[in-house]
Amino acid sequence: MDPRSEVLLRQPELFQGSLLLVGLPADDLLGKLPNARGWCWHAGDQAALDARFEGRVDFGVEAPEATFEAAVLFLPKARDLTDYLLNALASRLAGRELFLVGEKRGGIEAAAKQLSPFGRARKLDSARHCQLWQVTVENAPQAVTLESLARPYQIELQDGPLTVISLPGVFSHGRLDRGSALLLENIDKLPSGNLLDFGCGAGVLGAAVKRRYPHNDVVMLDVDAFATASSRLTLAANGLEAQVVTGDGIDAAPMGLNTILSNPPFHVGVHTDYMATENLLKKARQHLKSGGELRLVANNFLRYQPLIEEHVGYCHVKAQGNGFKIYSAKRS
């Protein structure tokens, strides 16, 4: 069981009423708290929880409509996402209890200060390298809309400026990261047809490619509902259309692709996790047509080239700079 869940279960009497678990891990916590429901935005966690606790977890970027007497927020990595979630919860919990649990290395001590606008926060427990904080909501805020927290920015491309709409919690929120910038300089001569933007984030790559190659059918895929919500806003801001899918890794992608384009993630929360990218590299061949291309950008220190050659085909470095490399391989 996740150590954050174990910390909650050290004081189970606090969590016996109608409870909303927000950003909960895919463990057995719901089985221990029969009156609790979950709210999740990670497609992989959602699938795992649905398989065990069908009908007890809501998925998406907005708080569920069902009433709850208390809520526990599992601290996310991004401070701005924490602010959005705390606001969404506190606005519904006037006079009631709001809890925050997280790992010490994830910044729980500092994040606890984000409870102070709602009332006097206090630390209830510290164990398993985690902390549990609580506040009685004395100052319930007005709920803010997610879109009001978006950070739009523009990037200059060969065919003109592209507007990107970035939501809280999305990778490289409010700015273009160096890896994507390098890949955007190298989206020439992509195969025509069906293209997948894997790990689409705010939709920078997918939108840029759709505008440059308008006859291509573009699918944008991410495991995170905040990312796919951002991608839809980015497409709309530029008058573009593409299919946006929230799904768990390459298994959620269509078959018969001509191109897979990616700036793949290797972090989940505060943890390093290469599984999604390694799974992409191992299974890309199944999703690509013969002659289809995998083109991705990665940090120099990530040794993806041997894995690509083993599972896709001959791989070469198309470009490099600022600590990143672009790998290109065509399915033989």
UniProtKB/Swiss-Prot annotation:
Q: Which reaction does it catalyse?
A: guanosine(1207) in 16S rRNA + S-adenosyl-L-methionine = N(2)-methylguanosine(1207) in 16S rRNA + S-adenosyl-L-homocysteine + H(+)
Q: What is its EC number?
A: 2.1.1.172
Major subcellular site? cytoplasm
Q: A single GO CC term, please? A: cytoplasm
Keyword hit for Transferase: yes
Tell me the enzyme class: transferase
The organism's place on the tree of life at top rank: Bacteria
Q: Where in the cell is it found?
A: Cytoplasm
Q: Which GO terms describe its molecular function?
A: 16S rRNA (guanine(1207)-N(2))-methyltransferase activity
- Provide this UniProt record's keywords sorted from A to Z: Cytoplasm, Methyltransferase, rRNA processing, S-adenosyl-L-methionine, Transferase
Similarity section: Belongs to the methyltransferase superfamily. RsmC family.
Q: How does it assemble?
A: Monomer.
Summary of the function given for this chain in its UniProt record: Specifically methylates the guanine in position 1207 of 16S rRNA in the 30S particle.
Protein name according to UniProt = Ribosomal RNA small subunit methyltransferase C
